[in-house]
A protein has these predicted regions:
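N-terminal low-complexity or simple alpha-helical regulatory segments
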Residues: 1-119, 139
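A short interface-forming secondary-structure element
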Residues: 119-131
Length: 149
């Protein structure tokens, strides 16, 4: 998982009055120094997400992360989609570059008989899968809103 999604989670926690150190057990600088340019293992991100849900007592935290985190929390995805000339192009950008944010997720657009369906599949299933998919889908909803949908 890209550290960008961790920043989104930390943004929402700070909005709810929870310090990053309470979630991480160390300073934010120490964590990013440890990770460097590497991605955060998905199991570690899910453990942090579970801890964040417990700290905030908010079961829909993944949804809130996707809806209320700053645009900067989504890294290059926000400016790439905002520069797309059409929604179809923006969705193509998302499907092309989403592996940079998280492995194990497949986003696809299918169109049939005038109906467009956007699907987000998460490989593997565990109790936190719902929160994780909610985070991703909420980010997609933000993009749809930017296109007036």
């Amino acid at each position: 998982v890209s550290t960008i999604l961790l920043r989104a989670l930390l943004d929402v926690l700070q909005q709810r009055g929870v310090a990053p150190e309470a979630l991480l057990g160390c300073s934010l600088e120490a964590l990013f120094l440890e990770l460097g340019e590497r991605a955060l293992p998905i199991a570690r991100f899910q453990a942090l997400l579970a801890r964040a849900i417990a700290l905030t007592d908010e079961p829909a935290l993944g949804l809130l992360c996707g809806l209320y985190a700053s645009d900067a929390s989504f890294g290059l995805m926000a400016p790439l989609t905002s520069c797309a000339p059409t929604l179809r192009h923006a969705l193509a950008v998302v499907t092309q570059f989403q592996p940079l944010l998280v492995d194990g997720v497949r986003i696809r657009l299918t169109e049939s008989m005038g109906i467009a369906r956007l699907r987000c599949d998460l490989t593997g299933c565990d109790p936190l899968a719902r929160s994780f998919v909610e985070l991703i889908v909420a980010g997609l909803v933000r993009m749809l809103r930017a296109f007036g949908c």
